[in-house]
From Swiss-Prot:
Similarity comment: family membership: Belongs to the SecD/SecF family. SecF subfamily.
Gene: secF
Gene Ontology cellular component annotations, sorted alphabetically: plasma membrane
Source organism phylogeny: Bacteria, Pseudomonadati, Pseudomonadota, Alphaproteobacteria, Rickettsiales
Protein name per UniProt: Protein translocase subunit SecF
Record carries keyword S-adenosyl-L-methionine: no
Amino acid sequence: MQIYPLRLLPNKIDFDFMNFKKVSYTFSIILSLISFIWIGIYKFNFGIDFAGGIVIEVRLDQAPDLPKMRGVLGKLGIGEVVLQNFGSERDLSIRFGSNSEENLMKNIELIKGSLQSNFPYKFEYRKVDFVGPQVGRQLIEAGAMAMLFSFLAIMVYIWVRFEWYFGFGILIALVHDVILALGFMSMTKLDFNLSTIAAVLTIIGYSVNDSVVIYDRIRENLRKYHKKNITEIINLSINETLSRTILTVITTLLANLALILFGGEAIRSFSILVFFGIIVGTYSSIFISAPILTMFVNRKFNKKVIER
């Protein structure tokens, strides 16, 4: 039995992506500036991981229903509330932010009252600790270093596999994706916490993967078509990989949509940010990282790339 590959688009498609190069550059610059300005004015909605807060340690008489608990405490209007098991499944850590001593005591009592009235468990409150913002600053620095090292590792990989100017194209696209992702977080007031740092790193990985697929096809077509100029080759390469790109986007967006709808509050910020980042990363792979090669690549300069 013969198996046919799934294709959303015809085999021969000839859309002129490069014709929109200036428009896409202008559009991306405007969005990046808006993101910068918005972040500068409205900042981020830092979660407990970065802003500090209160940690309540509780032991219950049985394993709690964590998703239901998160839903109940999330409706109290006191901001982000993080629930985690530690030690045994009956030991529970409850974390939330507090900006004053008055709110601190009020919110602790509010949480205790809500748990007692909504759940049939016996609660033994063992400890209440304050986590200062100093820990948050250390986490911010660690998150920034993680992104920096990921950028450097990606640049080395692209330089070894292709050439330095391919790496430059991906670097510009990644900076664009990260700026827009951070701007989106600021605009939507998503909690800025460790899970959103993981989401940004996921976006970086997805965007690089998409760009490498197109770059591979560009290199292959440079070997095949000696008389075509670089603009024609980039257009051809994007069109040839477009069906794969669309299928990948659809499947990953559907998976993220399921996480947004059914994953619960614990991974909501992560799922929404990755959903947005997949769209932005796909756009940047087609309209930024590939077209930017025209600034560097010509037939004479391509020799090293073709031979690799």
